[in-house]
């Protein structure tokens, strides 16, 4: 890589609403791969890099916005305590939603492809490659987060309402044929 892409950031985060294996359609929109990246507010270095990349994307987007940065510009970095106060996974965190029409490459800590879809899920921790870009679509102007690749770093408590089968059931003796 000869020139630095100033709009690209590798974001250490907790994955939420992870649609990384199959594209998902939201409200009838075009299906996309997506993830919500939950970033600890104490990770000031990552948050600063994201803010800098958003500023670069704003500057690069002036051409799409008539030569100036609009006052009511939508940006992707949000405060979980303000925008998601009811969701404890977002407490004391910043977050952003990233998406792409193209499937991300998903790798482990050794940068080997992960093929087992159950290995990467909402609640695990990883790093996500994000490229920030300006848009002007149907009168909406802003900076969006483009989903790149994903690296799983470690497991975490799964997010969502689905219960773990081990918590719901106990082993049954094969000789106990209670359905007979």
Residue ranges of each PLM-predicted region?
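Exposed beta-sheet edge/beta-hairpin loop segments within beta-rich domains
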Residues: 110-126, 133-143
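OB-fold/S1-family single-stranded nucleic acid-binding modules
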Residues: 137-157
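Acidic, gly/ser/pro-rich intrinsically disordered tails
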Residues: 1-7, 157-180
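A beta-strand/beta-hairpin structural motif
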Residues: 98-102, 106-115
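Generic short beta-strand segments
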Residues: 18, 101, 131-133
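OB-fold ssDNA-binding interfaces and closely related basic DNA-contact patches used
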Residues: 1-95
């Amino acid at each position: 890589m000869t020139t630095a892409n100033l709009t690209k950031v590798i974001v250490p985060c907790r994955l939420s609403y992870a649609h990384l294996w199959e594209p998902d359609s939201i409200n009838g929109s075009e299906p996309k791969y997506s993830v919500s990246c939950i970033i600890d507010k104490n990770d000031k270095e990552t948050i600063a890099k994201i803010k800098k990349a958003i500023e670069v994307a704003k500057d690069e987007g002036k051409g799409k916005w008539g030569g100036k940065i609009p006052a009511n510009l939508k940006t992707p970095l949000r405060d979980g305590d303000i925008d998601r106060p009811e969701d404890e996974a977002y407490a004391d965190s910043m977050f952003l939603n990233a998406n792409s029409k193209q499937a991300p490459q998903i790798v482990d800590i050794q940068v080997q492809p992960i093929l087992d879809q159950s290995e990467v899920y909402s609640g695990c921790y990883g790093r996500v490659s994000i490229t920030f870009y300006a848009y002007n679509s149907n009168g909406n102007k802003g900076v969006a987060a483009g989903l790149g690749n994903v690296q799983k770093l470690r497991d975490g408590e799964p997010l969502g309402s689905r219960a773990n089968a081990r918590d719901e059931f106990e082993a049954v003796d094969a000789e106990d044929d209670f359905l007979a």
